Amino acid sequence: MSIRIIPQDELGSSEKRTADMIPPLLFPRLKNLYNRRAERLRELAENNPLDDYLRFAALIAHAQEVVLYDHPLEMDLTARIKEASAQGKPPLDIHVLPRDKHWQKLLMALIAELKPEMSGPALAVIENLEKASTQELEDMASALFASDFSSVSSDKAPFIWAALSLYWAQMANLIPGKARAEYGEQRQYCPVCGSMPVSSMVQIGTTQGLRYLHCNLCETEWHVVRVKCSNCEQSGKLHYWSLDDEQAAIKAESCDDCGTYLKILYQEKEPKVEAVADDLASLVLDARMEQEGYARSSINPFLFPGEGE
């Protein structure tokens, strides 16, 4: 079952009631999203072998929070949603949606915010990006969206993605439509933008016990039932792995049918878990899954594959 975005004026009353039962989509809640992520990254950096990199990621997340409010986006997506709905495509499809110059404006603002905090190689990277031409930046963005990671160095990718993510999250936050669940394929990709998840989370509160995948680009979350592979939708050969015990707040769900895994975070075990931060801070679990022969079915926005990986 995939999820398609339906314009508000095309939803019947029965569909509106159905959408209220189990929300198929949770559009990004941008207020304090990046500050919460930055705080969680700093907290997880304590006594973590990746402490320096987690603090580095926290700096980027904090800069995203500042730039988000300094550079708001105004855009009417009504026509785009109608067109995408008619085509059965995500409304903000990364493979077809033309990129506005706004995302490069966000990138330059991020660089300006981060410069005073950076030194050494990291400072050299953002200064290099600052000097890049408009076309060079567009080429890097296109390569990342095409998963051509060998064309973008892994030290530049997090900065490019941080700006693209801000842009797409701002657009997703403006979608004036509703969502309904309908049968289809490719539920492993975000129904709003078509990007990959970073991790999944079993939530508390109004969505208690429901699992949502978190988009690594537009920050949307979409519902996928538990005990089913989020990559191939099979359920017969799933295994759950953790570094601590059965009550761990972070587990990896592996599937022997497709040979992949995705992390699951449990808010009931640790209410402060955050989709990006906790995924990044648990790379030891990724190493274990690689040893077991499984491939990761997601990408963390702060950790892109390098050339040859």
UniProtKB/Swiss-Prot annotation:
Q: Name one GO biological process term.
A: protein maturation
Q: Where in the cell is it found?
A: Cytoplasm
The protein's UniProt keywords, in alphabetical order, are: Cytoplasm
Any one Gene Ontology cellular component term annotated for this protein = cytosol
Q: Give the chief site where it resides.
A: cytoplasm
Picking any one GO molecular function of the record gives: ferric iron binding
The record, for SUPFAM superfamilies, names: FdhE-like
Q: Which domain of life is it from?
A: Bacteria
Q: Give a yes or no for keyword Cytoplasm in this entry.
A: yes
Q: Name one Pfam family in it.
A: FdhE_N
PANTHER family hit by this protein: PROTEIN FDHE
Q: Which family does it belong to?
A: Belongs to the FdhE family.
- Function (record text): Necessary for formate dehydrogenase activity.
Report the protein name in the record.
Protein FdhE
Species name: Shigella boydii serotype 18 (strain CDC 3083-94 / BS512)
